[in-house]
Amino acid sequence: MSPITTSKMSNFRWVICALLFIATTVNYMDRQVLSLTWKDFIAPEFHWTDDHYGTITGLFSIFYAIANLFAGKFVDWMGTKKGYLIAIFVWSTGAVMHAGCGWVAMQMEGYDSIEALRMVQAGSDAAVAIATISVWLFLSCRLILAVGEAGNFPAAIKVTAEYFPKKDRAFSTAIFNSGASVGALAAPATIPLLARSLGWEWAFIIIGVLGYVWM
């Protein structure tokens, strides 16, 4: 292999590493949208309590843990590129779907606006019904999100094994892993602002669409 070809291949590897970093950043931002919007924006509409939120986050962790058991095998079976793209598509779709939970709950309960849901008397049978339906809707979206997000690290690790020589694998792995910390820091700086200015639904949509853009 000529020096020029070797140099191009080396540069290409680091472009791939940058893409892995971005994907991991988006991965961690997607999962934090709910935690940063539920208290001030979602709970008043759906009459959630801390118990409702705890149920959703607890089951998401269980979904994610179980999905991790199969994600690596799925990537091996599908191939790195196809498996990674499917994982990103699934988690991005799950993220965007959260935005429709309010509309679906409104239709199922026969209300004509989201504001009408908010105006229901707290503690009433109607409020309990709204909370129950919305929790199930969000759980469905969290399940899809968890299944997709579980594929990120197995796929990213396999990419580094396939594209990087042993001498660079630890460093490239450290770079894409840092996306988790960057995503955790970027989310609180951006998501509440999006929710306040555009509505919590758009926070889910915009962050979710970043995954589609990556693809």
List the model feature ranges, each with a label:
Residues 15-50:
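Extracytoplasmic
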Residues 32, 61-69, 184-185:
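Residue-level signature of mid-helix packing/kink "hotspots" within the transmembrane helices
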Residues 37-65, 112, 116-123, 130:
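Extracellular/periplasmic helix-loop-helix junction of adjacent transmembrane segments
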Residues 67-79:
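Helix-to-loop junctions at the C-terminal end of transmembrane segments
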Residues 89-131:
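C-terminal ends and interior cores of transmembrane alpha-helices
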Residues 141-181:
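Cytoplasmic helix-loop-helix junction between adjacent transmembrane helices
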Residues 176-215:
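Helix-loop-helix hairpin linking two adjacent transmembrane segments in secondary transporters
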